[in-house]
A protein has these predicted regions:
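C-terminal regions of RecA-like/P-loop NTPase motor modules
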Residues: 231-250, 264, 283-284, 297-377
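Substrate-engagement module of ASCE P-loop NTPases
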Residues: 269-295, 307-313
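Interdomain "pre-motor" coupling segment immediately N-terminal to P-loop NTPase/helicase cores
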Residues: 33-101
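Noncatalytic partner-interaction/assembly domains of nucleic-acid and motor enzyme complexes
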Residues: 1-50
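Structural motif
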Residues: 141, 223, 248-253, 290
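Cytosolic-facing regulatory segments adjacent to core modules
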Residues: 129, 165-246, 260, 352-355
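Helical hairpin unit composed of two closely spaced alpha helices linked by a short loop
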Residues: 247-279
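The Walker A/P-loop phosphate-binding site
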Residues: 92-191
């Protein structure tokens, strides 16, 4: 305060800034500070983006004035030069290495992902692994209509990964942690969900419950209930878990817009969210991504353009029709899984699918006996 009072130019600030206000700023600084390079880079990108938008807007206004000035001739070059200057100034492209300088590193990464005949971590469904696996930097999405077992599929994947000693973060917009706990214990014990939640189980089953709770305590697993996803909270949660507990796989249940605003805004928001998970989290951090998305009654992924643009693989979960169950046989299960988009392997034709067995009471998915495709005459 003495320094501020010593100069006429700064004296007015001594009346505004009290010791208490300065202390408040100091206390807040720790909360506002960024504690990792990635978080700092994210803020820098936001600042540069705002600066680029400001300068681009100002240049475009000048270009607009040129277009309205009939005395100006041959304005194309002037407009091109003005826009090019802005694009060059804010270009984020660093030195671009030649392919010969990166091929050895890339091939080493390919080799590092090879294990037990698969690239990456296999799913619990052997036939699905012939099409795609769980890989760092990739985002695998299960799609299904509402209330058709998307969340239960993700839970099954999570447990299978925990059995493989993977570190898993499960971000849930559907179930709070209490309800999720009931589901995962029903899955692990094989006790029907209704009996488990109402206490209608035997002493032997109670022992099984305690055993599975004890096992879960040994796993590297975090479940976070976030009713409404937003990019900053998701990114912060992932970084915190990665730093404090380690993280191999991120599971997102599920990808959807906030529903606020008009349909276009929600659509754009969803696109940015999926892009952030695929590129900023899975890509930049080297984390495997699994998620779920809503499908329409016609078997299409809702907002498919935005999701499909970023997803590595999309697999559709559907009920088998009574005719399909009769034709395939009951031993071939009651669900079908179709790989409808795949950047890491083959896709299925319209009549192809993987046969699964689904028991909603026990929160269980298993691969069933695979059906023999039949050609109708």
């Amino acid at each position: 305060m003495e320094v501020l009072n010593a100069d006429e130019a700064t004296r007015k600030y001594s009346d505004i800034l009290s010791v208490e206000k300065l202390q408040e700023l100091i206390d807040m600084s720790d909360v506002l500070a960024r504690h990792s390079v990635e978080e700092y880079q994210m803020i820098v990108r936001n600042v540069l983006d705002a600066a680029f938008r400001r300068d681009a807007f100002q240049i475009l206004r000048k270009c607009e004035a040129l277009c309205l000035d009939r005395s100006k001739e041959d304005i194309e070059q002037e407009i091109y030069a003005a826009i090019d200057d802005v694009m060059t100034e804010y270009s984020s492209t660093n030195e671009i290495p030649q392919y010969k300088d990166v091929i050895d590193k890339c091939w080493s990464e390919v080799l590092s992902r090879q294990q037990n005949g698969y690239a990456g971590i296999p799913f619990k469904f052997p036939t699905l692994n012939e099409y795609a696996t769980i890989e760092p930097g990739e985002l695998f999405i299960f799609a299904a209509e509402a209330k058709q077992g998307k969340s239960m599929m993700l839970l099954n994947c999570a447990v299978d990964l925990l059995k493989k000693d993977m570190a898993v973060l499960y971000l849930d917009s559907e179930l709070n942690t209490r309800l999720f706990t009931a589901r995962i214990i029903a899955h692990l014990t094989g006790i029907e969900y209704k009996r488990l939640t109402t206490g209608n189980y035997s002493e032997e089953e109670a022992t099984k419950i305690e055993e599975q709770i004890a096992w879960l305590k040994t796993r590297k697993f975090t479940h976070i209930y976030i009713p409404m996803f937003d990019q900053q909270s998701i990114y912060t949660a992932v970084k915190k878990v990665q730093h404090t507990q380690g993280l191999d796989v991120l599971i997102v249940d599920y990808f959807k817009g906030s529903g606020d605003g008009d349909a276009f805004d929600s659509y754009q928001e969803l696109g940015r969210f999926v892009d952030m998970v695929k590129n900023k989290i899975c890509g930049d951090m080297g984390i495997c991504g699994i998620g779920a998305a809503q499908a329409t009654v016609n078997g299409k992924v809702a907002d498919s353009a935005k999701i499909g643009r970023n997803a590595s693989t999309i697999a559709m979960i559907q009920d088998k029709t009574p005719e399909e169950i009769e034709m395939d046989g009951e031993e071939c299960g009651n669900k079908k899984l179709r790989v409808v988009l795949n950047r890491n392997g083959a896709q299925m034709a319209s009549g192809e699918y993987i046969s699964l067995f689904f028991d909603g009471n026990r929160v269980l998915y298993e691969e069933a006996k695979q059906h023999t495709p039949q050609t109708p005459f």
